[in-house]
Curated annotation (Swiss-Prot):
The gene is sasA. The keyword Ribosomal protein does not apply. Disruption phenotype: No growth phenotype in low, continuous light, dysregulation of expression of many genes. In a light/dark regime cells grow very slowly. At medium light lowers kaiA and kaiBC expression, attenuating but not destroying circadian rhythms and affecting the expression of many genes (clock output). Chromosome compaction remains rhythmic. Loss of circadian control of gene expression; KaiA protein levels are unaffected, KaiC is constitutively phosphorylated. Phospho-RpaA is barely detected. This is Adaptive-response sensory kinase SasA. It catalyses: ATP + protein L-histidine = ADP + protein N-phospho-L-histidine. The keyword Nucleotide-binding applies.
Length: 387
Protein backbone atom coordinates (compact mmCIF):
# COMPACT_ATOMS: atom_id res chain seq x y z
CA UNK A 1 0.00 0.00 0.00
CA UNK A 2 3.04 2.28 -0.17
CA UNK A 3 4.48 4.33 2.70
CA UNK A 4 2.80 4.16 6.08
CA UNK A 5 0.48 6.96 7.08
CA UNK A 6 1.48 9.77 9.40
CA UNK A 7 0.33 9.82 13.05
CA UNK A 8 -2.13 12.57 12.15
CA UNK A 9 -3.80 10.41 9.53
CA UNK A 10 -3.76 7.36 11.77
CA UNK A 11 -5.57 9.32 14.49
CA UNK A 12 -8.67 9.61 12.32
CA UNK A 13 -10.25 6.37 11.04
CA UNK A 14 -11.54 5.98 7.54
CA UNK A 15 -15.34 6.06 7.94
CA UNK A 16 -17.30 3.86 5.55
CA UNK A 17 -20.96 2.83 5.28
CA UNK A 18 -21.96 -0.14 3.12
CA UNK A 19 -25.63 -0.19 2.02
CA UNK A 20 -27.02 -3.59 0.99
CA UNK A 21 -30.36 -5.30 0.51
CA UNK A 22 -31.58 -8.81 1.35
CA UNK A 23 -30.44 -10.52 -1.85
CA UNK A 24 -28.07 -13.49 -1.37
CA UNK A 25 -25.44 -11.66 -3.43
CA UNK A 26 -25.31 -8.93 -0.80
CA UNK A 27 -23.72 -11.16 1.83
CA UNK A 28 -21.04 -12.18 -0.65
CA UNK A 29 -20.27 -8.52 -1.38
CA UNK A 30 -20.15 -7.68 2.33
CA UNK A 31 -17.59 -10.40 2.90
CA UNK A 32 -15.45 -9.32 -0.07
CA UNK A 33 -15.47 -5.70 1.13
CA UNK A 34 -14.38 -6.82 4.59
CA UNK A 35 -11.58 -8.91 3.09
CA UNK A 36 -10.27 -5.96 1.06
CA UNK A 37 -10.34 -3.68 4.10
CA UNK A 38 -8.73 -6.32 6.32
CA UNK A 39 -5.61 -6.22 4.16
CA UNK A 40 -4.85 -2.66 5.31
CA UNK A 41 -6.74 -2.54 8.61
CA UNK A 42 -3.68 -3.65 10.59
CA UNK A 43 -1.96 -0.35 9.80
CA UNK A 44 -4.91 1.91 8.99
CA UNK A 45 -7.93 2.41 11.29
CA UNK A 46 -11.12 1.71 9.37
CA UNK A 47 -14.71 1.89 10.59
CA UNK A 48 -17.18 0.00 8.40
CA UNK A 49 -20.91 0.06 9.11
CA UNK A 50 -23.09 -2.37 7.15
CA UNK A 51 -26.63 -1.05 6.71
CA UNK A 52 -29.72 -2.76 5.35
CA UNK A 53 -31.50 -0.22 3.15
CA UNK A 54 -34.87 -1.36 4.50
CA UNK A 55 -33.82 -0.50 8.05
CA UNK A 56 -32.39 2.96 7.34
CA UNK A 57 -34.39 4.51 4.46
CA UNK A 58 -33.64 8.00 5.77
CA UNK A 59 -29.92 7.49 5.14
CA UNK A 60 -30.59 6.15 1.66
CA UNK A 61 -32.52 9.31 0.89
CA UNK A 62 -29.96 11.52 2.61
CA UNK A 63 -27.12 10.15 0.46
CA UNK A 64 -29.40 9.99 -2.62
CA UNK A 65 -28.51 6.38 -3.30
CA UNK A 66 -30.24 4.78 -6.28
CA UNK A 67 -28.35 1.49 -6.60
CA UNK A 68 -27.37 -1.21 -4.12
CA UNK A 69 -24.88 -2.28 -3.04
CA UNK A 70 -23.37 1.14 -2.37
CA UNK A 71 -20.32 2.10 -0.31
CA UNK A 72 -20.16 5.64 1.07
CA UNK A 73 -16.87 7.11 2.22
CA UNK A 74 -17.93 9.65 4.83
CA UNK A 75 -14.49 10.94 5.76
CA UNK A 76 -11.88 12.15 6.24
CA UNK A 77 -12.06 14.54 3.33
CA UNK A 78 -14.85 14.77 0.83
CA UNK A 79 -17.63 12.22 0.61
CA UNK A 80 -17.50 9.64 -2.18
CA UNK A 81 -19.89 6.89 -3.29
CA UNK A 82 -19.14 3.59 -5.00
CA UNK A 83 -22.05 1.49 -6.22
CA UNK A 84 -23.05 -1.39 -8.45
CA UNK A 85 -22.29 -5.10 -8.71
CA UNK A 86 -18.61 -4.33 -9.40
CA UNK A 87 -18.36 -2.38 -6.16
CA UNK A 88 -15.54 -4.54 -4.78
CA UNK A 89 -13.41 -3.95 -7.88
CA UNK A 90 -14.03 -0.23 -7.54
CA UNK A 91 -13.04 -0.38 -3.88
CA UNK A 92 -9.80 -2.26 -4.61
CA UNK A 93 -8.84 0.47 -7.10
CA UNK A 94 -10.07 3.38 -5.00
CA UNK A 95 -8.78 2.43 -1.54
CA UNK A 96 -5.12 3.41 -2.20
CA UNK A 97 -6.31 6.83 -3.41
CA UNK A 98 -8.43 7.28 -0.29
CA UNK A 99 -5.42 6.56 1.89
CA UNK A 100 -3.35 9.11 -0.05
CA UNK A 101 -6.17 11.63 0.33
CA UNK A 102 -6.32 10.86 4.03
CA UNK A 103 -2.59 11.58 4.39
CA UNK A 104 -2.91 14.81 2.37
CA UNK A 105 -5.92 15.90 4.39
CA UNK A 106 -3.96 15.78 7.65
CA UNK A 107 -0.55 16.80 6.24
CA UNK A 108 -0.72 20.39 7.52
CA UNK A 109 -2.99 19.77 10.52
CA UNK A 110 -2.40 19.14 14.18
CA UNK A 111 -3.32 15.65 15.36
CA UNK A 112 -7.04 15.83 16.14
CA UNK A 113 -8.37 14.96 19.55
CA UNK A 114 -10.34 11.79 18.97
CA UNK A 115 -13.69 11.97 20.71
CA UNK A 116 -16.15 10.11 18.52
CA UNK A 117 -19.65 9.42 19.91
CA UNK A 118 -20.88 5.93 19.23
CA UNK A 119 -24.29 4.63 18.32
CA UNK A 120 -26.01 1.69 19.99
CA UNK A 121 -24.44 -0.53 17.35
CA UNK A 122 -20.97 0.55 18.42
CA UNK A 123 -20.31 2.47 15.19
CA UNK A 124 -19.11 6.10 15.13
CA UNK A 125 -21.94 8.60 15.05
CA UNK A 126 -20.58 11.19 12.63
CA UNK A 127 -22.02 14.68 12.04
CA UNK A 128 -23.48 13.33 8.80
CA UNK A 129 -25.31 10.61 10.72
CA UNK A 130 -26.52 13.13 13.28
CA UNK A 131 -27.84 15.32 10.49
CA UNK A 132 -29.50 12.33 8.84
CA UNK A 133 -31.19 11.36 12.11
CA UNK A 134 -32.44 14.91 12.63
CA UNK A 135 -33.66 15.02 9.03
CA UNK A 136 -35.45 11.70 9.51
CA UNK A 137 -37.15 12.93 12.69
CA UNK A 138 -38.37 16.04 10.88
CA UNK A 139 -39.67 13.85 8.07
CA UNK A 140 -41.54 11.69 10.56
CA UNK A 141 -43.08 14.72 12.25
CA UNK A 142 -44.09 16.16 8.90
CA UNK A 143 -45.57 12.82 7.81
CA UNK A 144 -47.52 12.53 11.07
CA UNK A 145 -48.88 16.07 10.73
CA UNK A 146 -49.77 15.52 7.08
CA UNK A 147 -51.58 12.28 7.89
CA UNK A 148 -53.42 13.98 10.75
CA UNK A 149 -54.48 16.88 8.54
CA UNK A 150 -55.59 14.54 5.78
CA UNK A 151 -57.62 12.52 8.28
CA UNK A 152 -59.39 15.62 9.62
CA UNK A 153 -60.16 16.79 6.09
CA UNK A 154 -61.63 13.40 5.24
CA UNK A 155 -63.80 13.40 8.35
CA UNK A 156 -65.09 16.90 7.66
CA UNK A 157 -65.85 16.06 4.03
CA UNK A 158 -67.74 12.93 5.01
CA UNK A 159 -69.66 14.56 7.83
CA UNK A 160 -70.70 17.62 5.84
CA UNK A 161 -73.02 15.49 3.73
CA UNK A 162 -74.01 12.61 5.99
CA UNK A 163 -75.05 14.68 9.00
CA UNK A 164 -77.69 16.34 6.86
CA UNK A 165 -79.59 13.08 6.29
CA UNK A 166 -80.79 12.30 9.85
CA UNK A 167 -81.08 16.01 10.63
CA UNK A 168 -83.36 16.61 7.65
CA UNK A 169 -85.50 13.61 8.59
CA UNK A 170 -85.79 14.80 12.19
CA UNK A 171 -86.73 18.33 11.19
CA UNK A 172 -89.30 17.03 8.71
CA UNK A 173 -90.88 14.86 11.40
CA UNK A 174 -91.04 17.75 13.87
CA UNK A 175 -92.52 20.10 11.25
CA UNK A 176 -95.16 17.51 10.36
CA UNK A 177 -96.10 17.13 14.02
CA UNK A 178 -96.50 20.87 14.35
CA UNK A 179 -98.69 21.15 11.25
CA UNK A 180 -100.90 18.22 12.21
CA UNK A 181 -101.34 19.39 15.78
CA UNK A 182 -102.96 22.57 14.46
CA UNK A 183 -105.56 20.72 12.37
CA UNK A 184 -107.42 19.02 15.22
CA UNK A 185 -108.24 19.89 18.79
CA UNK A 186 -109.10 16.45 20.12
CA UNK A 187 -106.76 13.79 18.83
CA UNK A 188 -108.15 10.36 18.12
CA UNK A 189 -106.31 7.24 19.22
CA UNK A 190 -105.12 6.66 15.66
CA UNK A 191 -103.88 10.23 15.32
CA UNK A 192 -102.07 10.01 18.65
CA UNK A 193 -100.44 6.79 17.52
CA UNK A 194 -99.23 8.54 14.40
CA UNK A 195 -97.88 11.45 16.41
CA UNK A 196 -96.05 9.09 18.74
CA UNK A 197 -94.50 7.36 15.75
CA UNK A 198 -93.28 10.69 14.37
CA UNK A 199 -91.87 11.65 17.75
CA UNK A 200 -90.05 8.31 17.90
CA UNK A 201 -88.61 8.91 14.45
CA UNK A 202 -87.43 12.39 15.39
CA UNK A 203 -85.91 11.13 18.63
CA UNK A 204 -84.14 8.28 16.87
CA UNK A 205 -82.66 10.52 14.18
CA UNK A 206 -81.53 13.14 16.66
CA UNK A 207 -79.83 10.47 18.73
CA UNK A 208 -78.10 9.27 15.59
CA UNK A 209 -76.75 12.78 15.06
CA UNK A 210 -75.62 12.89 18.67
CA UNK A 211 -73.82 9.55 18.26
CA UNK A 212 -72.04 10.64 15.08
CA UNK A 213 -70.92 13.91 16.63
CA UNK A 214 -69.59 12.03 19.66
CA UNK A 215 -67.65 9.68 17.38
CA UNK A 216 -66.17 12.56 15.43
CA UNK A 217 -65.09 14.39 18.56
CA UNK A 218 -63.37 11.29 19.87
CA UNK A 219 -61.78 10.37 16.55
CA UNK A 220 -60.34 13.85 15.99
CA UNK A 221 -58.52 13.91 19.31
CA UNK A 222 -54.76 13.50 19.10
CA UNK A 223 -53.92 9.81 19.00
CA UNK A 224 -51.37 10.23 21.79
CA UNK A 225 -53.83 11.94 24.12
CA UNK A 226 -55.27 9.70 26.79
CA UNK A 227 -59.05 9.48 26.81
CA UNK A 228 -60.65 11.02 29.87
CA UNK A 229 -63.13 8.85 31.72
CA UNK A 230 -65.14 9.25 34.92
CA UNK A 231 -65.55 5.69 36.23
CA UNK A 232 -68.01 4.79 38.95
CA UNK A 233 -70.18 1.85 39.95
CA UNK A 234 -72.42 0.80 37.05
CA UNK A 235 -75.12 -1.86 36.99
CA UNK A 236 -74.89 -3.35 33.51
CA UNK A 237 -78.44 -4.69 32.94
CA UNK A 238 -80.33 -1.35 33.22
CA UNK A 239 -77.74 0.38 31.06
CA UNK A 240 -78.09 -2.32 28.41
CA UNK A 241 -81.87 -1.97 28.43
CA UNK A 242 -81.55 1.78 27.85
CA UNK A 243 -79.36 1.13 24.82
CA UNK A 244 -81.76 -1.50 23.45
CA UNK A 245 -84.63 0.94 23.85
CA UNK A 246 -82.65 3.61 22.04
CA UNK A 247 -82.07 1.26 19.09
CA UNK A 248 -85.49 -0.37 19.27
CA UNK A 249 -86.79 1.15 16.04
CA UNK A 250 -83.68 0.02 14.17
CA UNK A 251 -83.86 -3.69 14.91
CA UNK A 252 -87.67 -3.84 14.97
CA UNK A 253 -87.87 -2.36 11.45
CA UNK A 254 -85.68 -5.26 10.22
CA UNK A 255 -87.67 -7.83 12.21
CA UNK A 256 -84.51 -8.99 13.93
CA UNK A 257 -84.49 -11.05 17.10
CA UNK A 258 -82.46 -9.76 20.05
CA UNK A 259 -81.37 -12.23 22.72
CA UNK A 260 -79.80 -11.10 25.99
CA UNK A 261 -77.89 -13.42 28.29
CA UNK A 262 -76.92 -11.45 31.39
CA UNK A 263 -76.53 -13.43 34.64
CA UNK A 264 -78.48 -12.13 37.60
CA UNK A 265 -75.38 -12.29 39.78
CA UNK A 266 -73.21 -10.29 37.37
CA UNK A 267 -71.06 -7.95 39.49
CA UNK A 268 -71.34 -4.22 39.05
CA UNK A 269 -68.82 -2.60 36.73
CA UNK A 270 -66.31 0.14 37.43
CA UNK A 271 -66.80 2.21 34.29
CA UNK A 272 -67.79 5.53 32.83
CA UNK A 273 -71.49 4.91 32.03
CA UNK A 274 -71.57 7.36 29.13
CA UNK A 275 -68.49 5.81 27.53
CA UNK A 276 -69.77 2.28 28.10
CA UNK A 277 -73.09 3.26 26.53
CA UNK A 278 -71.15 4.64 23.55
CA UNK A 279 -69.38 1.30 23.05
CA UNK A 280 -72.63 -0.66 23.30
CA UNK A 281 -74.43 1.65 20.87
CA UNK A 282 -71.61 1.41 18.33
CA UNK A 283 -71.32 -2.37 18.48
CA UNK A 284 -75.08 -2.97 18.47
CA UNK A 285 -75.59 -0.45 15.68
CA UNK A 286 -73.05 -2.37 13.58
CA UNK A 287 -74.70 -5.69 14.44
CA UNK A 288 -78.10 -4.37 13.37
CA UNK A 289 -76.62 -2.85 10.23
CA UNK A 290 -74.92 -6.03 9.01
CA UNK A 291 -77.48 -8.59 10.17
CA UNK A 292 -80.06 -9.34 7.45
CA UNK A 293 -83.80 -8.97 8.10
CA UNK A 294 -85.03 -11.76 10.37
CA UNK A 295 -81.53 -12.42 11.70
CA UNK A 296 -80.47 -12.81 15.32
CA UNK A 297 -78.32 -10.62 17.55
CA UNK A 298 -77.10 -11.89 20.91
CA UNK A 299 -75.75 -9.82 23.80
CA UNK A 300 -74.05 -11.84 26.53
CA UNK A 301 -72.12 -10.97 29.68
CA UNK A 302 -69.75 -13.29 31.49
CA UNK A 303 -67.89 -12.83 34.77
CA UNK A 304 -64.62 -14.31 33.56
CA UNK A 305 -62.27 -13.40 36.41
CA UNK A 306 -62.41 -11.68 39.78
CA UNK A 307 -61.46 -8.42 38.10
CA UNK A 308 -63.03 -8.47 34.64
CA UNK A 309 -66.42 -8.90 33.00
CA UNK A 310 -66.53 -9.94 29.34
CA UNK A 311 -69.33 -8.57 27.17
CA UNK A 312 -69.98 -10.17 23.77
CA UNK A 313 -72.21 -9.02 20.91
CA UNK A 314 -72.84 -11.59 18.16
CA UNK A 315 -74.67 -11.28 14.87
CA UNK A 316 -75.67 -13.54 12.00
CA UNK A 317 -74.41 -11.22 9.29
CA UNK A 318 -72.03 -11.79 6.41
CA UNK A 319 -68.89 -11.86 8.57
CA UNK A 320 -65.51 -10.20 8.10
CA UNK A 321 -62.70 -11.45 5.81
CA UNK A 322 -59.87 -12.92 7.86
CA UNK A 323 -57.24 -10.69 6.24
CA UNK A 324 -59.15 -7.60 7.37
CA UNK A 325 -59.58 -8.53 11.04
CA UNK A 326 -56.26 -6.92 11.98
CA UNK A 327 -57.18 -3.47 10.61
CA UNK A 328 -60.82 -3.21 11.59
CA UNK A 329 -60.12 -1.10 14.69
CA UNK A 330 -58.08 1.52 12.81
CA UNK A 331 -59.38 4.99 11.96
CA UNK A 332 -61.30 5.42 8.71
CA UNK A 333 -61.14 1.74 7.81
CA UNK A 334 -64.00 0.80 5.50
CA UNK A 335 -64.22 -2.86 4.52
CA UNK A 336 -65.40 -4.01 1.11
CA UNK A 337 -68.73 -5.03 2.66
CA UNK A 338 -69.26 -1.42 3.83
CA UNK A 339 -69.64 0.16 0.40
CA UNK A 340 -73.44 0.20 0.62
CA UNK A 341 -73.59 1.15 4.31
CA UNK A 342 -73.48 4.49 6.08
CA UNK A 343 -70.61 5.40 8.36
CA UNK A 344 -67.07 6.70 8.42
CA UNK A 345 -65.05 3.76 9.69
CA UNK A 346 -64.25 5.51 12.97
CA UNK A 347 -66.76 3.88 15.34
CA UNK A 348 -64.68 0.80 16.16
CA UNK A 349 -61.57 2.93 16.62
CA UNK A 350 -63.45 4.99 19.19
CA UNK A 351 -64.65 1.80 20.91
CA UNK A 352 -61.08 0.57 21.19
CA UNK A 353 -59.92 3.82 22.77
CA UNK A 354 -62.73 3.74 25.30
CA UNK A 355 -62.13 0.12 26.27
CA UNK A 356 -58.38 0.65 26.58
CA UNK A 357 -58.98 3.72 28.75
CA UNK A 358 -60.76 1.32 31.15
CA UNK A 359 -57.71 -0.99 31.01
CA UNK A 360 -59.78 -3.48 29.07
CA UNK A 361 -59.40 -5.32 25.79
CA UNK A 362 -61.56 -5.49 22.65
CA UNK A 363 -61.32 -8.04 19.85
CA UNK A 364 -63.40 -9.74 17.17
CA UNK A 365 -63.96 -13.31 16.00
CA UNK A 366 -65.52 -13.77 12.59
CA UNK A 367 -65.85 -16.10 9.63
CA UNK A 368 -67.24 -15.18 6.24
CA UNK A 369 -70.87 -16.22 6.00
CA UNK A 370 -71.07 -17.07 9.71
CA UNK A 371 -71.42 -13.68 11.35
CA UNK A 372 -69.19 -11.86 13.80
CA UNK A 373 -68.75 -11.65 17.56
CA UNK A 374 -67.20 -8.60 19.19
CA UNK A 375 -65.86 -9.11 22.70
CA UNK A 376 -64.65 -6.52 25.18
CA UNK A 377 -63.81 -6.50 28.87
CA UNK A 378 -64.60 -4.05 31.65
CA UNK A 379 -63.31 -3.98 35.25
CA UNK A 380 -65.59 -4.94 38.12
CA UNK A 381 -66.42 -2.32 40.72
CA UNK A 382 -64.01 -3.51 43.39
CA UNK A 383 -61.13 -3.20 40.92
CA UNK A 384 -58.81 -0.29 41.78
CA UNK A 385 -57.98 1.73 38.69
CA UNK A 386 -54.26 2.43 38.23
CA UNK A 387 -53.25 6.04 38.70
Amino acid sequence: MGESLSPQALAQPLLLQLFVDTRPLSQHIVQRVKNILAAVEATVPISLQVINVADQPQLVEYYRLVVTPALVKIGPGSRQVLSGIDLTDQLANQLPQWLVQQEAFFADREPPEVNIPFTELGQPETPALQQADAFFQLQQQYADLSERTKFLEQVIALVAHDLRNPLTAALLAVDTIQIRSQSFSVATAKEMQGLCSLFDQARSQLREIERMIAEILEATRHSGESLRINPREVVFEPLLQQVLEQLHERWRSKQQQLITDVPGDLPTLYADPDRLRQVLVNLLDNAIKYTPPGGTITIAALHRTSQKVQISISDTGSGIPRDQLSVIFKNLVRLSRDSSQEGYGIGLSVCQRIVQAHFGRIWVASELGQGSTFHFTMPVYRYTMPC
